[in-house]
Amino acid sequence: MERYDILRDLGSGNFGVAKLVREKANGEFYAVKYIERGLKIDEHVQREIINHRDLKHPNIIRFKEVFVTPTHLAIVMEYAAGGELFERICNAGRFSEDEGRYYFKQLISGVSYCHAMQICHRDLKLENTLLDGSPSSHLKICDFGYSKSSVLHSQPKSTVGTPAYVAPEVLSRKEYNGKIADVWSCGVTLYVMLVGAYPFEDPEDPRNIRNTIQRILSVHYTIPDYVRISSECKHLLSRIFVADPDKRITVPEIEKHPWFLKGPLVVPPEEEKCDNGVEEEEEEEEKCRQSVEEIVKIIEEARKGVNGTDNNGGLGLIDGSIDLDDIDDADIYDDVDDDEERNGDFVCAL
C-alpha cells in the first residue's frame, strides 16, 4: 500500500470492505476491495480478477491491479463516484421511461461487450451497476465474482446469482447459456427501474424466496396500473421474460428493438473527454498491466492466510448473491438478520 493513501470506507459486505484510495504518484482515485487472506480467496475471487482484467469498455469498471497485504488480498479498480444505481432508484422511487432507457442502453452496451469477449456475468443487478459521478451519469458494470468465460470454462450449470434476478433455466441445475441468462437479468433491471419493485416477488410475501422462485419458473409478473409505460416497452419485456431460453430475445435483437432505438445516443465517457493523451495513457497502462501468471501467483499467496490459518467465514450470501447449489431447498433469509439488507427486497420505501 506504499503507493496509495487510504481516504475512507466505501462499503462492506461478506467479502470484506471496500475503501477509497488515492495514488500518491498522480493523485488518481481508485476503489480497493479488501478480502481476508485464507479460504475466502476462492474460485469466485480468482474468476472475478482474471475475467475482469481483460475487460476494457466505458460501461465496465476498469481493473487496475491486485496485490497482497499481510492480512488481505487487495483488488484495485476504477472508482465510480456516483454510487450504486440501486441507491438512485431508492431515492427516485422509479424512473421515467426515457431515463430507464438511458441506463438500459448503457447496461446492454456493457453486457454486449462482455459477451463478445466470451464472458457472461451471471449476477447482473442494480447493486452491481455503478454511476461514474459525471454530469452525464454513465453506468458502469462491476463485480465479476460469478462471471464465467466460455474460453476458460465449460458452459455454466451452477445455480448462482441473486434470487430476484435469476432466469428460470439457472434454477434447473443443468447446463445453460449464460449469455441468454444475462438477458433475463437485464430485463429484471429494466423492470425495477421503471416500476420500482421486483417483477417476480410475491407482493403479499416479498421475502418468501420459494414464492419468488415459483413465480420466476411460471413467468408470473404484471405491470401495475399506476405505471405508465409504452406498448413497445411492454413488448420488449415480454420478449425478455420468456421461460424457454431458446425463444428469448438476444442482446443483438434487443439492440435492434424499436423501443431500444428511441431516444438520444449515449456518448461514452471516453469520447466526451476528447483527450489526445488517452491513447498514450492506455498504451502505458497496457505495458504496466499484470500478467495472468503474476495474478495467479499473488492469489496463491493470498490463499495461504495469516500465520498459516484460514479465514473462511463460510459461504452463503455474498453481497446478496448466492450459490443455490450450496443450499438444500432452504429459505436463505433464515440465515440473515432481520436488520440486514436483503437483495431481492428493497430496503427503502418505494
Curated annotation (Swiss-Prot):
- Active site (UniProt): D123 (proton acceptor)
**Induction line:** By abscisic acid (ABA), salt, and osmotic stress (at protein level).
What's one GO-annotated cellular component? nucleus
The protein's matches in Pfam families, at most eight in alphabetical order, are given as: Pkinase
Q: Where does ATP bind?
A: L10, G11, S12, G13, N14, F15, G16, V17, A18, K33
Domain Protein kinase positions = 4-260
**Which chain positions lie within coiled-coil regions?**
270-303
> Mind telling me which CDD domains this protein's record contains?
STKc_SnRK2 (cd14662)
Q: Keywords, A to Z?
A: ATP-binding, Coiled coil, Kinase, Nucleotide-binding, Serine/threonine-protein kinase, Transferase
**EC numbers, comma separated:** 2.7.11.1
Q: Is DNA-binding a UniProt keyword of this protein? A: no
GO BP terms, alphabetized: response to osmotic stress; response to salt stress
Could you say which tissues express the protein in this record?
Expressed in seedlings.
Principal EC category: transferase
Q: Would the keyword Glycoprotein turn up in this protein's UniProt record?
A: no
- Which family, according to the similarity comment? Belongs to the protein kinase superfamily. Ser/Thr protein kinase family.
Task: List the protein's name.
Answer: Serine/threonine-protein kinase SRK2F
Biological source species: Arabidopsis thaliana (Mouse-ear cress)
The taxonomic lineage of its organism, from the top, reads: Eukaryota, Viridiplantae, Streptophyta, Embryophyta, Tracheophyta
Q: Which gene encodes it?
A: SRK2F
